[in-house]
A protein has these predicted regions:
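Short, well-ordered alpha-helical segments
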Residues: 2-36
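A cross-kingdom feature marking charged/low-complexity
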Residues: 39, 44-67
Length: 67
């Protein structure tokens, strides 16, 4: 029987949602092993004064198997 743990984190990217998710998973995997999946809870954007998108932000939960 395995036990999993869930952590919540935020990540951002100037390129898009997918890049923000990849960045968050990449940073998490540097210290967290056995990552099994992620849930995107929230997507936000930061805008410039003219309304154009400056940055994409995601809040996500990552689950991993505890040794």
């Amino acid at each position: 029987m395995s036990v999993t743990k869930v952590i919540e984190l935020s990540a951002s990217s100037e390129r898009g949602i997918e890049d923000a998710v990849k960045h968050g998973l990449g940073k998490a995997s540097a210290t967290v092993k056995n990552i099994k999946g992620a849930w995107i809870n929230e997507i936000k954007v930061a805008t410039n004064d003219d309304g154009s998108i400056r940055e994409w932000r995601v809040n996500m939960r990552i689950n991993f198997v505890v040794d």
